[in-house]
Amino acid sequence: MENELVSKVKAPVPGNQTNTLNEAKCPVGAHTLAGARSNANWWPNQLNINILHQHSPLSDPMPEGFNYAEEFKTLDLDAVVKDLRHLMTDSQPWWPADYGHYGPFFIRMAWHSAGTYRIGDGRGGAGSGEQRFAPLNSWPDNGNLDKARRLLWPIKQKYGRKLSWADLMVLAGNVALESMGFKTFGFAGGREDVWEPSEDIYWGPEGKWLDDKRYSGERDLENPLGAVQMGLIYVNPEGPNGKPDPAAAAVDIRETFARMAMNDEETVALIAGGHTFGKTHGAGVPTEYVGPEPEGAGIEEQGLGWKNKLGHGHGYHTITSGLEGAWTTNPIKWDNGFFDNLFGYDWELTKSPAGANQWTPKNGAGKDTVPDAHDKTKRHAPFMATTDISLKVDPIYGPISKRFHEHPQEFADAFAKAWYKLTHRDMGPLPRYLGKLVPKEPQVWQDPVPAVDHELVNDSDVAALKAKLLASGLTVSQLVTTAWAAASSFRGSDKRGGANGARIRLTPQKDWEVNQPKELAKVLPVLEKIQHDFNAQGGKKKISLADLIILGGCAAVEEAAKKGGHSVKVPFTPGRTDASQEHTDVKSFSVMEPKADGFRNYHQKGQPRPAEEMLVDKAQLLRLTAPEMTALVGGLRVLGANYGHSKHGVFTSHPETLTNDFFVNLLDMNNRWQPSGADGVYEARDRQGDHVKWTATRVDLIFGSHSQLRAFAEVYACNDAKEKFVHDFVAAWTKVMNLDRYDLAKKKAAAN
């Protein structure tokens, strides 16, 4: 897809906006001004837990109980597609369509909505309509996509809450492809809009657009980032840092697309398929003609940016990337024109009217073969970006490109599946996919699990299985740790992981260091024996290992609460199934291996971020609130869930008993804390006798150090909070155990 890098735009510092308001302080608004110093300004090293409080119902305009999935099911999808097809050629004078067709524009919009996804932490992607908000709406690479969304507004307005912006942007890309003769693989609805920018996504360390401080060494890109520069979706089309070196650009392409979960064939298919359509825009030098991005524009622009002073400011005079030209002879039709031109000409370096580095056929070849986008009397030669030439000269991409050129149907199939993957990668498992256009064929990247094909266990079965689990010789610690390891692999970002599928018994999860493979190898056979014995009783009733792992954890929590004097029933709902190794993409799952899990007091050495920061990041991926995170850490410590049976943070003389001892002893003023000789480890000494009472990590001590977390800890340390703590822990535990149970959400919605 066209990468509209605004390489020549004056680079504003993110956050520096034109203040069009009267700067005289109003007595009402004086304390809400953006310029006021925040706590983060005063104490930049303070742990930020705000990411655990984002997307609150208080910022959601939808009514209480609103269920987008149910609303989408009532949508007339055929009517939406019909309206989108009409829009494709309904050129508007305020933003005329290139070649009379908006298709390429909407493909770019959908691509850039989805293309922010990165596998490192699962964040980014098209799943929540974030392109509407800062910073994405003002990224240089998203130049003029504000107009694409405004073109879609009448359709969004027509269908209202039945159709989210997130779904509409992807669907518009699909319909655009279909309207130009391409057969897509499918489309799923189900992306629910957010109503504020997500604060948990780390876009990079840079303080200005198009900077690249994210690199170290020769060209080592910081994890989990995917793009090469701040404000780009993926790579610089002119080449690394604007240097027109196709071989070097191929290195960037391979790394960036791999971090978007794409292999070499998918990468070639996506670039070539996207560049079969449309053109780039560089009618003039951006710094001379183009105004501020949407977030920096004046209030009268009403959320639009990049106002262009050249000529009409649109159409023939459009300026976006600084690159100028089309790749094919028919930019609004699916064909093999991209490869025809890539291999049909020898290419030489030239400059666009804006001064950007790009390529043109040597010796004037190809002259007048490409129509002008707005003037039928004009013709042009085709163009290629440096990153397009990479697909020809790279020793891996080159043969793939040649094969696709010689086998057009193979190319079409590859692009269809790669586009589907690109636009659906962050949607999670198939139960979240909605609508009549969903393909029946599951893809391995969707982490498929088998459908339930047996009768589920009832309450009496559950009670009997709990008794067997507790009498199996496995400890409370082992049962809790195994259930947590399985369930906490979930990522709310791209909805991957979780206990369903019991992939903790498969490669690679069974070998992850954090899961203590030797210990896991002792626990799983015991659970498998209990499962086998139950399922061998005959009849249709069975239990999966995935269900049994979670049931074991629930039984252990109940037992630990009982030992602490509290009778509690931990909710358990069967219905999980066991995935196969064949349906588990090892490479894709490998990137999910935790480098830290503060809930288990695990932190790999050499991590650039402090342990407490990684705890908050983990909690956010688990969709936990700060109080839920607090309750879980305190409970898991006394239950003995620490990695390697470490005693750090186990502030109790009654291990494997669910008590509030962690909080009581952490806040005990008879203790004084000091660093120990070990890195990242602290010790509590009695103020009177000076003997060591406890040891702790930074994750443990943050609940006494951070003022807000300490406030939560104080709640649970109070004398009247013992029962409250147990119930809060059970509620948070149950939430984590069921994070991947989208089937339960569907049943709940159907019941309502």
Swiss-Prot record:
GO terms for biological process: cellular response to hydrogen peroxide; hydrogen peroxide catabolic process. Keywords: Heme, Hydrogen peroxide, Iron, Metal-binding, Oxidoreductase, Peroxidase. It catalyses: H2O2 + AH2 = A + 2 H2O; 2 H2O2 = O2 + 2 H2O. Its EC number is 1.11.1.21. Binds 1 heme b (iron(II)-protoporphyrin IX) group per dimer. One of its GO terms (molecular function) is heme binding. Its cofactor is heme b. GO terms for cellular component: cytosol. Heme b binds at residue 275. The keyword Disulfide bond does not apply. There is a cross-link at residues 111-234 (Tryptophyl-tyrosyl-methioninium (Trp-Tyr) (with M-260)). The active site is at residue 112. Residues 1-20 are annotated as: Disordered. CDD domains: catalase_peroxidase_1, catalase_peroxidase_2. The record marks 108 as: Transition state stabilizer. It comes from the Bacteria. Formation of the three residue Trp-Tyr-Met cross-link is important for the catalase, but not the peroxidase activity of the enzyme. There is a cross-link at residues 234-260 (Tryptophyl-tyrosyl-methioninium (Tyr-Met) (with W-111)). Homodimer or homotetramer. Belongs to the peroxidase family. Peroxidase/catalase subfamily. Bifunctional enzyme with both catalase and broad-spectrum peroxidase activity. This is Catalase-peroxidase. It comes from Koribacter versatilis (strain Ellin345).
